[in-house]
Amino acid sequence: PHSLIGLVLLISCVATWADQYNPRSSFLDTSYSKLILKNESSKTYNLEQRPDGLSQFYLDGAPYENNATRFLAIYHSPNIPLISDGSMAARAPAVVLVHGGGGTAFGEWVKRWNDAGFAAIAIAVEGQTDVIASQSRRGRDRWMNSAFGGPRREGIYDDYTKSTGNEWMFHAVFAAIQANNFLRSQENIDHQQIGIVGISWGGVITATTIGYDHRFAFAIPIYGSGFLSDIPNQYGDSLIRNPEY
């Protein structure tokens, strides 16, 4: 009896260990933790002041297929920072803005948050610029590619057979964390009041990002960003067949 009990306990422990250890999860935890521990962004590339007064530049993304990548960011801080009692503050609260499918880093979105007293950084997470390639194209193909862009989204997690470091969602979350690091490197930002906002696929990225980067003070995922496999539409149909999801 004692041998049987011991065997059952051993099997239980092994099963628990197997459930807890997942190479994919281990890779994500390690990669994101290293980036978060830096707590500062890498250098900016191709910094320029836009005609609308905003700053535009590129930040380092994660390597893609063994090649360095960079992603577009548009940033500006408010003229009058907001704090909770409505008075003027020395440091501004800030927010990372993540677009949805077919979008990009939008300067107008940055301005709206500036008007509310927030510094804001909008990022492009599919290797694109904010320059229109063709008015006749729709979605992601509407925008010109950047020179060092990373992967594009492939359907609804259709790239799950790739190595984790080459999956689009890994790169998108990496970019969001890097944007947080950038904000934390700015002296005029209140590091205790930095949040993240995402719309649609940006909401999915937002919800995923806050599972790894606990430095964010708030997160606002806007519509269509959770329990996708339970939705009776193309998302549910696709994800129910996806073993990794």
Locate predicted features:
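Cap/lid segment of the alpha/beta-hydrolase catalytic domain
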Residues: 105-107, 111-174, 225-241
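Short beta-strand element of the alpha/beta-hydrolase
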Residues: 86-100
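Boundary at the C-terminal end of the N-terminal hydrophobic targeting segment
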Residues: 16-18
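Bacterial N-terminal signal peptides that target proteins for export
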Residues: 1-5
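Loop/turn elements at helix/coil->beta-strand transitions in domains of secreted/extracellular proteins
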Residues: 91-94, 116-119, 191-192, 214-218
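N-terminal cap/lid segment of alpha/beta-hydrolase-fold proteins
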Residues: 35-90
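Primarily recognizes the serine-hydrolase "nucleophile elbow" in alpha/beta-hydrolase
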Residues: 177-242
